[in-house]
């Protein structure tokens, strides 16, 4: 029997995948202590884990501040997490000494979980609730200008805040070492190797176990007419305008529609509903998806994974950079289409496209079979029990960094040659124009070379 400490932030999308893993570990005879928050108590205690409340360490917020949490920046969130870590210092110090965990299983963005595992030198496994991201897979993320600005200008603020941790025994090299996982960190990712972008670029410290779900039900699409399910998740779901457009778009179609709107809006604000459309605050999403023929989704990792697990094709409506990455990958495998126009006509057209073309359903079904062939919660539990795991010795990212150095040298040589040619044959007067022109024309060449190097290294990584 091992003693395992679970840590997570107060978020459904991060907590939910950890619950079946906790249940599996308890069933295997391990003692699990789950440090979380009161809104998750019931779910956690159902797994058999011991629930430890951490609500008193959260900042006190008025109603307006709670509402603004939906729009909080990554910088503000990181600073808040650092301050929560400091508030929890004395409490967790006593807990670690009393419980003496053999392993820490922590959400990837739960600073107090990571930092205390390092501080007390306890083997750590990281729960990754979305894709595993490195310098290759992060190319899938499409950040807004505001998100990019926040990253650039926020790093110095976070670095300054991190220094407040040092007197308490928390030693962090830099911000990235805290928020990102390298190839020597044991990580569980709740998807398959086939669905994970650039999965070959991750060492065997990463275990791709497939979606973490309790349900054993299978897809059952046999109905009198198609069922369309709509949900915007649990965070950015205050979208009455969007739901109204969905209702107007689908009310006259020969389909049934279920909308899960959360508790952010009053259902009555959506007006009188046609007979074929029902609106609920919450539903059993897996059960609905097992019957649904199409899913309009915000593209949270859990929602997309559950949809694919139940072989349901999607209309993608991502709201954040990470959600766009998930949508982009699901579109690549042919399991749906992007909603580029959220007007009434745009929604109607997108739903008809998914329902009329059975290739989307076939692609989703193929992915479903792939997910169900993964090791699942049993594989995750075994991985945690055996932490720390050993590497196979090949560090793909180390090779990528070497290749990137070569790429940068070649890129700038080509750019300089183009600048000289521009100056000799056209004009030296506007050197900045020459520089931009050179950069634009040499970039495609450089990217093609870079992709070729990555492909070569990926073959080496997989032994081909």
Stretches found by the model and what they are:
Residues 1-12, 21:
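Nucleotide-activated donor-dependent transferases that construct or modify glycoconjugates
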Residues 2, 30, 37-46, 50-227, ...:
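Nucleotide-sugar-dependent glycosyltransferase catalytic domains
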Residues 15-28, 40:
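Short amphipathic alpha-helix
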Residues 22, 104-106, 282-328:
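A donor-sugar binding/catalytic signature common to diverse glycosyltransferases
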Residues 225, 261, 265-282:
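Nucleotide-activated donor-binding/catalytic signature segment of Leloir-type glycosyltransferases, i.e.
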Residues 346-413:
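C-terminal amphipathic helix plus adjacent low-complexity
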Residues 440-461:
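Membrane-helix interfacial anchor on the cytosolic side
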């Amino acid at each position: 029997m091992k003693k395992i400490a679970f840590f997570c932030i107060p978020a459904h999308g991060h907590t939910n995948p950890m619950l079946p893993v906790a249940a599996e570990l308890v069933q295997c005879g391990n003692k699990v202590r789950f440090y979380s928050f009161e809104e998750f108590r019931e779910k956690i205690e159902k797994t058999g884990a011991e629930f430890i409340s951490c609500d008193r360490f959260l900042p006190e917020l008025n109603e307006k501040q709670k509402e603004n949490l939906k729009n909080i920046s990554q910088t503000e969130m990181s600073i808040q997490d650092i301050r929560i870590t400091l508030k929890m210092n004395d409490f967790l110090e006593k807990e670690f000494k009393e419980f003496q965990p053999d392993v820490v299983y922590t959400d990837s963005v739960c600073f107090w979980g990571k930092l205390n595992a390092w501080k007390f030198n306890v083997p750590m496994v990281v729960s990754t609730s979305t894709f595993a991201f490195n310098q290759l897979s992060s190319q899938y993320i499409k950040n807004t200008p505001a998100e990019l600005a926040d990253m650039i200008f926020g790093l110095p603020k976070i670095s300054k805040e991190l220094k407040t941790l040092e007197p308490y025994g928390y030693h962090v090299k830099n911000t990235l070492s805290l928020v990102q996982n390298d190839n020597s960190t044991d990580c569980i990712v709740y998807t398959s190797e086939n669905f994970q972008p650039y999965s070959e670029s991750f060492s065997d410290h990463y275990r791709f176990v497939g979606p973490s779900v309790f349900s054993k039900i299978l897809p059952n699409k046999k109905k009198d007419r198609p069922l369309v399910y709509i949900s915007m998740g649990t965070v950015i779901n205050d979208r009455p305008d969007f739901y109204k457009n969905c209702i107007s778009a689908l009310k006259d179609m020969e389909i049934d529609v279920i909308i899960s709107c959360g508790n952010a809006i009053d259902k009555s604000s959506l007006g009188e509903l046609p007979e074929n459309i029902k609106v609920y605050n919450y539903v059993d999403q897996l059960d609905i998806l097992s019957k649904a023929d199409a899913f309009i989704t915000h593209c949270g990792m859990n929602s997309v994974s559950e949809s694919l697990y139940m072989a349901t094709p999607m209309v993608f409506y991502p709201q954040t950079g990470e959600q766009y990455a998930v949508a982009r990958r699901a579109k690549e495998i042919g399991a749906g289409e992007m909603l580029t126009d959220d007007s009434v006509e745009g929604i109607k057209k997108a739903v008809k496209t998914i329902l009329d073309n059975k290739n989307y359903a076939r692609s989703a079904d193929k992915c479903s079979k792939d997910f169900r062939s993964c090791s699942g919660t049993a594989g995750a539990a075994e991985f945690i029990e055996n932490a720390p795991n050993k590497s196979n010795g090949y560090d793909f990212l180390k090779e990528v960094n070497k290749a990137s150095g070569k790429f940068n040298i070649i890129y700038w040589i080509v750019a300089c040659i183009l600048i000289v040619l521009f100056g000799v044959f056209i004009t030296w007067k506007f050197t900045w124009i020459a520089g931009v022109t050179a950069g634009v024309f040499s970039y495609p060449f450089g990217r093609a070379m870079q992709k070729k190097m990555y492909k070569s290294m990926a073959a080496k990584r997989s032994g081909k």
